[in-house]
Regions:
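Active-site beta-loop-alpha junctions enriched in small/polar residues
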Residues: 17-21, 47-53, 105-107, 144-146, ...
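Histidine/acidic-residue-rich catalytic or RNA/ligand-binding cores of hydrolases
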Residues: 54-63, 106-121, 151-158, 169-183, ...
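Aromatic-anchored helix/helix-loop segment that forms the rim or "lid"
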Residues: 75-81, 124-152
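Aromatic-lined glycan-binding groove of carbohydrate-active enzymes
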Residues: 87-132
C-alpha cells in the first residue's frame, strides 16, 4: 500500500502508530515499511496510537481527568519511549534515506534529558550520554500544541533544523502554535526554519512548496 500511495501527487510518506516503536523489539515488525521509506526517500510520521491487538485506550474511560491523563500524560510518555528506541538503538541505521517524523517534540525528552544524563552517569557510565544521541540524522520533531518555553527547550536539545511546524495541527488549528513560535526566544533564523524552511528543505523532492509569505496567507 505504501508503494502504491507514495506515487500519488502530494504524498510524502505514511503514518505509523506510536506503539510500533515503544521498544526495539516492537519496531522490528516495521522494518519493511522503514525499507520502503528509505527506498523512496520518504517520510514516516510516528503518531501516538495502538498497533493491532493492543489494549486501547490504556487510560480507562471514566478515570478522573481522563482527557489530561490520556491526551497528554499517556501520549507524552509513549512518545518519549519512541524517542529512546529511535535515538538510542540501531533500528534506523540501515535506513539512512528514510525520514522519520514524530509529533509533540518527541514527548518529554527535552525536559527529561538532564535527568537521563545524570542517571546514565550513575548507572551506566560506560554508555553514551542520552543527550549526545538525540540529534539523529533524518529524525524530525513537530512542535504543534506546545508553548514558547517547550519550543525553546526543543531547539536547545535537537537544533532548530530538526523542528517542523503544523504537521500535526489540523484538529487544533494554528493560532496557538503561531503564537508560541512567535514568542519563543530562538531568533529569527530559527523561527523561519521552523515555520517553513525545514519542511521545504527535507520534503521538496516529494512535494511542491509555496514561498513562506504565500503559505502564511
Amino acid at each position: 500500500e505504501f508503494e502504491r500511495a507514495i506515487d500519488l501527487p502530494g504524498i510524502v510518506g505514511g503514518v505509523v502508530p506510536g506503539n510500533a516503536f515503544l521498544t526495539r523489539p516492537d519496531a522490528e515488525a516495521y522494518r519493511p515499511l522503514l525499507a520502503a521509506a528509505n527506498a523512496h526517500k520518504a517520510m514516516l510520521f510516528i503518531h501516538w496510537g495502538p498497533t493491532p491487538g493492543d489494549t486501547w485506550p490504556r487510560t480507562p474511560p471514566g478515570t478522573d481527568n481522563f482527557a489530561r491523563r490520556m491526551g497528554t500524560i499517556d501520549m507524552q510518555q509513549s512518545l518519549s519511549a519512541d524517542m529512546v528506541t529511535l535515538c538510542m538503538t540501531d533500528i534506523l541505521d540501515e535506513y539512512p534515506d528514510a525520514m522519520i517524523h514524530i509529533h509533540n517534540l518527541g514527548g518529554n525528552i527535552p525536559y527529561e534529558i538532564e535527568r537521563m544524563d545524570h542517571r546514565c552517569l550513575l548507572d551506566t557510565p560506560d554508555e553514551p550520554l542520552p543527550s549526545t544521541c538525540m540529534n539523529k540524522p533524518g529524525l524530525y520533531m513537530d512542535c504543534n500544541s506546545f508553548g514558547a518555553q517547550a519550543i525553546e527547550m526543543g531547539v536547545k536539545l535537537y537544533g532548530a533544523d530538526k523542528i517542523l511546524f503544523g504537521t500535526d495541527g489540523t484538529e487544533f488549528g494554528a493560532d496557538w502554535s503561531n503564537k508560541a513560535v512567535a514568542e519563543a526566544d530562538i531568533g529569527e533564523a530559527a523561527r523561519n526554519a521552523i515555520l517553513h524552511g525545514n519542511a521545504a528543505r527535507v520534503l521538496s523532492h516529494l512535494a511542491t512548496f509555496a514561498p513562506l509569505s504565500e503559505a502564511a496567507e
